[in-house]
């Protein structure tokens, strides 16, 4: 009888741990999707201010609604970023002209570029010294881009030098504007 009670308690504690992880994940997702909605809203506002006599309906392309959430793949740090892929995201060590700056000595000044093409996120290695490795799935060894490009997929890991970046790709939906 006592063993049965301990098993139930252990199972309940495990369920609480799973719920906490799911809750934290949902909170993280809500934050980066909320940030993307704000960026999208700002793009619409900027367009409206530049074109005061035109309707802002359907002015942004499919590429403008495509976003990427980037975070360090192996640590729970503060460094998390949300970018509109339609704006082109340059990643490198250099402080000029890069949207994401990595302080890794094995990363080139301008290492790679994330961009949108026909509503799909792509990555292009800018002939970096050490190349760009894309890992897909848990057991994938990855493949090297060296001066070439490929389509990015959700949950890809980009390896630049010693830096590993996990990617989430998503589109801004109209219902994101209703969240507050």
PLM ranges: what are they?
Residues 97-98, 108, 122, 129-132, ...:
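Short, surface-exposed beta-strand-loop junctions and turns on beta-sheet-rich folds
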